């Protein structure tokens, strides 16, 4: 829950001086990106902006405290303030902030600006007490905010110092409205107005001016002088002389003498006790001070001018002026030291009663009450964990003695999940092992089962599927049906283990079960994970269309639950890119890979390795080797500076080896082959992929026999495990092996198998990257006119893709080629005496490449009837009667010119 008072603009008080000259300057705030109000404490920053904000509707107010250095807390309140200003316009951002479903503050702000693009009225966001922010991540995020905020939004920041928000740049670009302490200082006229409304007996203008000069227009000093004068301790001028030259850090003695010592003991204790509250209402005051009618007491303190201010229009919430509040808290530690723990306990109990466990934890920590802290955590820790209050939980658990954790194993489990969320896998197992060894009376087997579910998740994350399987099975055997979270975890882990072992059908069933349970209990990140795993399994089985449909369900879940900022979103767009690439939808595949990189923009560059490999695959499929080389340099740098799962390494190696094949770089392939890992098994798609990389390198080096052994074993495993997509890839590589080894009939046999299997997988680009060797074989198959209709159509489509992206390898009938051909001593006399036109040579090249008449017309952007005329003319000039004869004639010409076809 968010504390309402932190989102309420302070109420404009009746006896404050209206700062007309400053309000006039602020009237043009909408022309600036940032309005910055800076001064030491007590110069009236908040009062001024509350006056300016009066009557404005499109304004959000966020009052900071020290706890707002937690990024998640800062995000929640800031988005809530924007929602307040826009009447709930940014619903997606609000949900993302509430559920902590964003990768970083900057990515959350980017989504906010997308939603605000539809908001066209002027909009203001006030952030008060920004000097309390010390978290550099928040500073950087707010710099991003200011750089990219909509033109109709003005950010108003109040701070005691110059914040780290890129102020100099804004000032140069005239996008900054500044008001500092010199402008905030009261003028003689304002000081006179102030005393006139505060004192029963007015003072002369000259006296008022001297007092104002003595304290340099400091508003807090003027307020203290008025308070002293009302209490008749001594003259206003005497107070002014005493305050002259005193700054906020030296006020303690003065405040003791002039404020605390001039109120009765009951009021003194009320002030000291209530000051421990960062914000307060009737219930909190009654519980903390022990006085009845807390609201009336607060209003009485307000009337006495004791630096208390209302925080909302209803008058329910109050807080002390920061300067006075800090002073009172220090005095409370000195004067009520013995009572202070009990006061904090009372505050914690009252916050709990009002449903604010995070505030209660703050006071339980201050009280040093481990038992109270334990009880709060037992009741609310998992809710705080699910809302990503990780820093607060970690601080709280550290404050508990180890014996208290042992007596409450749920808290040990919580601490372990905190470690797991921070990828401290080794510490998780150490903590759980120590706890199980020392816990004397653990409840039945349930807690052991929860420990094992977490251990299983750690094991699979750490690349140990056998241990993960053992632990997940133990957990599922012992967990009661109602312990849904750990059951979801264990079921998901077991499904992932089976996926790794190639038991795809069983894995798919478990992932579907995980999805169902996760949806039932609103555990959305596991629901998304299970859908991604289902898609990968279906892809491996060769059911790419069903994999696509499963991905669509995952995208829908992301949109419905606003999960766009989760790192898992990158996983989804990456496997979508892989599927699009397989279907030769290269522009869409590249766009998906780039969106994956964008999702991970706030993470370490190593996390982008997989998407970068996908971009390289797109370049390779297009035949764009220059771009591929540039991207490979970055990929190889990332490989050398990180530790990766075998799946990641396999995908990175794949694009490297294909690039070496396309460029004929045998030295690089040989060096890689000497050092690369050779997996013990090949029972899943990433192990199959690594062995396929090895076989491709061996083929490039002419090591046909060991490559054939590898590929035959891969095919045997793929067939037995129904890894149909891997089988399709293996057949294509085996085809290249046979072709280069001169075993043409074997090459044709496996190519026919690959084409048939592609009717299921839909593969196109896997054929295309094999380039000219593949094109030659497909042309021959098309010429034989024996392919079934589906295979014939696919072969023609593959040839079109090769022609589009690799034309330099085989479309040889350009002007230079024709000139050399006509000057060749062995050129047929018929061609020499009746030469083809340049257009007819182009048509012959496209016929040779396997294009139909309609496709040739589309390629050359002419009418189909025009193409028929060109074909009729070139047939006559070549002395051929049909297409197959024209292809054979073109083949003879290419051989004569030294092209291997």
From Swiss-Prot:
One of its GO terms (biological process) is positive regulation of DNA-templated transcription. ATP binds at residues 39-46. Residues 829-894 form the HTH luxR-type domain. CDD domains: LuxR_C_like. GO terms for molecular function: ATP binding; DNA binding; DNA-binding transcription factor activity. Activated by ATP and maltotriose, which are both required for DNA binding. Residues 853-872 bind DNA. InterPro entries: P-loop_NTPase, Sig_transdc_resp-reg_C-effctor, TPR-like_helical_dom_sf, TPR_MalT, Tscrpt_reg_HTH_MalT, Tscrpt_reg_LuxR_C, WH-like_DNA-bd_sf. Disulfide bonds: none annotated. Belongs to the MalT family. Monomer in solution. Oligomerizes to an active state in the presence of the positive effectors ATP and maltotriose. This is HTH-type transcriptional regulator MalT. It comes from Escherichia coli O139:H28 (strain E24377A / ETEC). The lineage of its organism: Bacteria, Pseudomonadati, Pseudomonadota, Gammaproteobacteria, Enterobacterales. The gene is malT.
